[in-house]
Design a protein with these regions (language model features):
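Low-complexity intrinsically disordered segments
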Residues: 7-8, 22, 32, 76
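Bacterial N-terminal signal peptides that target proteins for export
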Residues: 2-15
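Bacterial N-terminal signal peptides
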Residues: 13-23
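Charged interaction patches that mediate protein-protein contacts
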Residues: 1-2, 96
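Generic hydrophobic-segment detector
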Residues: 4-6, 19, 29, 36
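Transmembrane beta-barrel domains of Gram-negative outer membranes and organellar outer membranes
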Residues: 29-277
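Membrane-interface motif at the C-terminal end of an N-terminal transmembrane signal
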Residues: 24-28
Length: 277
């Protein structure tokens, strides 16, 4: 992602505008906790990234037959904390929450996500990394309480264009979904730098079913998100998108926003000064 520095007031203004736009769509707040196509770059050594994922399902499922809460008018807040340990390894931790009209906020569950990256010094023609995410959620939010995801990540910058492909594999470790084995859930992003500060593009999120045999088309989920990224500062991350469901099994309208901030807690080593002779 390209980063540029704007004055502090501009950063606050950009954040306020996006947040207010999303706030007025919110009535209450389920099933979409982290909607993001990953880039291959990991958080630098000694840096901690804190992200807030805000997702509101404006038009989703109003009923369910598995005892979980429906997604319609579900508002999700996810806190993601990621720390970089060296130039090729990071670990992320997620805290999922959900809110609905009349029920207040609920703790949903937590995941942990270690990720490895091909070091830049290898000079591969594309960026490559691999993440694994494992975690647990409460039964009222999913029949399959324990889950595991393997996510290969390949990306490339071509002039003003940016492409990223995440052919993720997901598996339930408990519950009725365990017998389905690994399921194919590809994500893809294409973006174009409209200016040095604004990237506009499309994000795709899908779930096709088990590798042993994909689900019928009507049971698959496919979503397209027109999205923008604001490159306001090397320390900040902003992403906003509106998701449109393309099948009957997909939530039909979702608003998402990601706000992230990088913190460098480790003190830089001071250079020794030579004493005059």
């Amino acid at each position: 992602m390209r980063t540029n520095i704007l004055p502090g007031k501009t950063i606050l203004l950009a954040l306020s505008v996006v947040f207010v736009c999303l706030w007025f769509t919110v009535v209450s707040a389920q099933d979409n906790y982290e909607i993001q196509v990953y880039g291959s770059e990991t958080v630098p050594r000694g840096v901690t990234m804190i992200e807030l994922h805000n997702n509101f399902t404006a038009k989703g499922a109003k009923t369910t037959d598995d005892g979980t809460l429906p997604t319609n008018h579900a508002w999700h807040e996810t806190i993601e904390i990621t720390h970089g340990f060296n130039e090729w390894f990071e670990t992320g931790f997620y805290i999922f929450t959900s809110a609905r009209n009349g029920s207040g906020w609920d703790y949903v569950g937590s995941h942990i996500r270690p990720r490895f990256r091909i070091p830049p010094k290898w000079k591969w023609p594309v960026g490559v990394s691999l993440s694994q995410e494992i975690g647990w959620v409460r039964r009222q939010f999913s029949e399959d309480q324990w889950s595991w995801e393997i996510r290969p990540i390949v990306d490339k910058e071509l002039g003003k264009w940016y492409l990223s492909f995440n052919p993720a594999l997901e598996r339930a470790l408990s519950g009725p979904g365990k017998k389905r084995g690994f399921e194919f859930a590809p994500n893809f992003k294409v973006a174009y730098s409209v200016t040095k500060k604004v990237d506009a593009g499309l994000e795709y999120y899908g779930s096709l079913g088990p590798l042993s045999g994909f689900d019928p088309a009507r049971e698959q989920t496919h979503q397209i998100f027109p999205a923008i990224d604001l490159n306001v500062s090397p320390k900040w991350e902003f992403n906003f998108g509106v998701g449109i469901g393309m099948t009957r099994s997909t939530d039909h309208l979702i608003f998402k926003m990601i706000v992230g901030r990088r913190f460098e807690f480790a003190k830089k080593k001071s250079q020794p000064t030579s004493s005059p002779e």
